[in-house]
């Protein structure tokens, strides 16, 4: 029995070492052989850019100078969407919220995008305000052969948009694809170009949103889709040096707030119906950015 236990432990250790030694693309290939195909980052970036080329980035009008943005992540929707619909109801009822963000892992496995769309449409729209939801893909949205489903429903996972206040203040929101733990060469160049352009504009704030976080203080997700140390350093320095104020991410299903110089990095809680403490974030964006976490009631 002890020999079997040792063999099992050594096997897990070997798999972990292989994952740690591989780059993100190689990890994705290995995972894909087990749970279904997932196109690499550069391929997904090209798919997103095809849509972006025909659909200009949008400007959303905020109702007030100090507006609110609702942020959720990791809904992992199957046929249950209690927390998801509570979130939709909350942001649609808030007249100061012109836009909401979903940071990925929208669905849990294949064939559940219809459940996402139907449950979204079941909540009445508020005719007194804009109703915009901006999303990016997470690792569950690209594996299990789901990238095509994501594209069919949400079109792009790399883009930016602008929120403009009544007095003409403009805030830039950059949404990027980190679903397999790397931006890839093409998207990294896009990010550099976008931030160089942004530095020449007069944006009040720059906000970024994506699925995978930079810092991990627990091992709940193992090493799934984490950045390499080198890419973490590159992106942190790029974001900090180009004036990104705050970065919203998900993935680890655990709340965390980390400061890197003037850059605030926030991991937002997950919002699955199975969570014991599901929550989302509400950011108030004015001359400064404040935020609070909102705990959801657990599913009855």
Predicted regions and their residues:
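Active-site glycine-centered loops adjacent to acidic/histidine catalytic or metal-binding residues
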Residues: 74, 104-105, 138-139, 211, ...
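Extended active-site neighborhood of metal-dependent phosphoesterases/phosphodiesterases
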Residues: 34-54, 112-204, 225, 231-240, ...
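Bacterial N-terminal signal peptides that target proteins for export
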Residues: 2-11
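Short acidic, glycine-rich surface-loop motifs adjacent to enzyme active sites
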Residues: 198-219
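C-terminal motif of bacterial Sec signal peptides marking the signal peptidase cleavage site
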Residues: 19-21
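N-terminal active-site segment of His-dependent metallophosphoesterases
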Residues: 25-114
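Histidine-centered catalytic micro-motifs
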Residues: 207-214, 245-255
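Hydrophobic beta-strand anchors of alpha/beta hydrolase catalytic cores
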Residues: 69, 100, 173, 206-207
């Amino acid at each position: 029995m002890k020999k079997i236990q040792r063999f099992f432990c050594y096997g897990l250790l070997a798999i972990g070492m292989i994952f740690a030694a591989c780059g993100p693309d190689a990890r994705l290939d290995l995972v894909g052989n087990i749970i279904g195909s997932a196109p690499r980052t550069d391929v997904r970036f090209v798919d997103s850019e095809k849509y972006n080329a025909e659909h200009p980035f949008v400007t959303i009008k905020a109702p007030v100078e100090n507006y609110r943005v609702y942020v959720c992540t990791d809904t992992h929707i199957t046929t249950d969407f209690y927390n998801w619909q509570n979130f939709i109801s909350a942001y649609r009822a808030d007249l100061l919220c012109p836009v909401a963000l979903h940071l990925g892992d929208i669905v849990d496995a294949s064939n559940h995008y219809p459940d996402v769309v139907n449950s979204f449409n079941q909540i009445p729209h508020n005719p007194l305000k804009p109703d915009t939801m901006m999303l990016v893909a997470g690792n569950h949205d690209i594996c299990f052969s789901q990238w095509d489903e994501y594209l069919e429903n949400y079109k792009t996972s790399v883009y930016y948009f602008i929120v403009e206040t009544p007095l003409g203040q403009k805030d830039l929101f950059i949404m990027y694809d980190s679903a397999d733990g790397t931006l890839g060469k093409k998207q990294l160049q896009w990010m550099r170009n976008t931030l160089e352009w942004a530095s020449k504009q007069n944006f009040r704030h720059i906000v970024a949103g994506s699925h995978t976080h930079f810092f991990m203080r627990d091992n709940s997700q193992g090493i799934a889709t984490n950045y390499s140390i080198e890419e973490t350093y590159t992106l942190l320095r790029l974001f900090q040096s180009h004036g990104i104020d705050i970065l919203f991410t998900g993935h680890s299903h655990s709340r965390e707030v980390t400061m890197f110089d003037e850059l605030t990095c926030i991991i937002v809680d997950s919002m699955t119906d199975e969570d014991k403490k599901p929550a989302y974030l509400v950011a108030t964006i004015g001359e400064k950015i404040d935020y609070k976490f909102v705990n959801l009631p657990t599913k009855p």
